Amino acid sequence: MAAAPIPTTTPVEGPAPAGSGLDGVVACESSITLIDGPKGELFFRGYAVEDLAEAADYLEVVHLLWHGQWPTPAEHRAFERRLRAQRSLPPAVDEVLRLIGRPEVDPMAAVRTVTSLLGALDPRADDTAPTAVLDSAVALLARMPSLVAALGRRRQGLEPIAPDPELGHVANYLYMLRGARPAEDEVVGLNTLMILHMEHELNASTFAARTVVGTLSDYYSAITAAICALKGRRHGGAIDAVVPLLREIGRPEAVPAYVERALDQGRKLPGFGHRVYRRRDPRAALQAGVARRLNARAPEPALFEVARRLEAEMLTRKGLPANVDYYAALGLAALGFPPELFTSFIVSTRVAGWTAHILEQLANNRLIRPRALYRGPRGLSLGAQPWHSH
């Protein structure tokens, strides 16, 4: 149960909150995700994330998040058909990507811009009825892999590849990115990574989405706000730095000296620690398995051994376990995603979780309006200032 609201007529003063950054503050009730931080457990709609990642199809879990129940075979087929019909990007998006799909433009800025453009092109964007929001969500979910893949190719000076109507959602992602049909184990690996990144309760980007849609702004504005939050290095942006870090270290035997220097310099290494999980991130072990299998035939197989050594060193020296970004970065690199697209990849799968929260917020909406503890001066007079003229 959320705390009682502070009366707006009373100045908010007094002791500081128990934790900065709203640590431990319950902002809403939700039936989407349960995180047990001390135990290192994660559940989507009551299902353990380990079970979903190992046995479910990404689109099955999307349906679960959006509708609160497992899809029937007929519902799953219908969902696939709707996505297949909407995967192609509008011509206006291709025009914009020709302008901003360049190496000097931050990929997340491009994804943010195109998402906003898609909202401007959607004639029902301002309709907040559940059916209208779901229609917009299906269209955006279908197009996100197309967008990220097209952006990646434009940044390399290559033409985008149209989706293959014979391929499913996950397989098409790799096909559009690389130009060749993926192997089955690659599809399985990417499916696992997408499930593990698709939702994570009330993190900064999800809270941003719920706050925006709580004002009865439109679906695309809420998703764009979430993308803006995810872009930050303290949130999703950290994943982009993992592979460059491992490449810089180079060899497993170089890890101890590298970590010692980094800690002496006060550096924080990406991929370690989490605000909620103190003992272990349940997603990390599953992603380590994906990374190990995919890296066995990747161009840089030695990176996995560097990662294992670094994980052990950080746990011994700092007590910090690997988080969701760490091995996901290795898995994505092995699949052909360049590091600068890793955060954009998260957008393409996390849009499912953001949408679930947007739907839940709209179903029982109340404007999100917290208060601040005032710590400044009071009772100042303009007349007391020597520079003030009457």
What are these regions (language model features)?
Residues 2-390:
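Hydrophobic alpha-helical bundle cores within soluble ligand-binding/oligomerization subdomains
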